[in-house]
Amino acid sequence: MDPKSKAPKRDETKGADDASGRRYLDGQLLIAMPVMEDERFARSVIYVCAHSSEGAMGIIVNRPAGSIDFPELLVQLEIIDKADQIKLPENAETMKVLKGGPVETGRGFVLHSSDFFIKDATLPIDEGICLTATVDILRAIARGAGPKHAILALGYAGWAPGQLETEIQGNGWLHCPADADLIFGGDIEAKYSRALHKIGIEPGMLSNEAGHA
């Protein structure tokens, strides 16, 4: 991982091969293999938001932030007053806050269902899944006008050009199609085993051999 990598622009040919035959993985899940040397990404599941010749950007979807919940974050950002925490809609009260990765950890990225869209701010990634990184979506969620499904990630994971491909070739990651139910639903810490089960693998079966489904 390159913690200084900037998020690349999303290539409009999502999932397509480039001229050199490389396949871009935006809209897919990365599942860390046991040989992952970087402890920050051990047993991580990452949703790839952008992947092109410029590099890659993704959000870790199974790492709770722990130190703050969504209502507290809204107060810190002065979107609501402290007294208004008890008046939030249920989906705002229970919205998950995650450690999205080591890059720009002070910035929020909302992965959400496609029933919410802000012109020039929302990036459609795959069918039913979008990314918005402006405070407007937090305001919408706070007043009950946001997307039906959403998670907030602080920071993201970034790769320099060709770096993700090298890590996959080095047995660092499995990759498979994304699952909206896995991204938005269920216990956060169970997502690693759920992602493996999705491609027919028991966690104990993992070895040093990488591949994809």
UniProtKB/Swiss-Prot annotation:
Residues 1-20 are annotated as: Disordered. Gene3D superfamilies: VC0467-like. It comes from the Bacteria. It holds the Pfam family DUF179. SUPFAM superfamilies: VC0467-like (SSF143456). GO terms for cellular component: cytosol. Belongs to the UPF0301 (AlgH) family. HAMAP family: UPF0301. This is UPF0301 protein RPC_0788. It comes from Rhodopseudomonas palustris (strain BisB18).
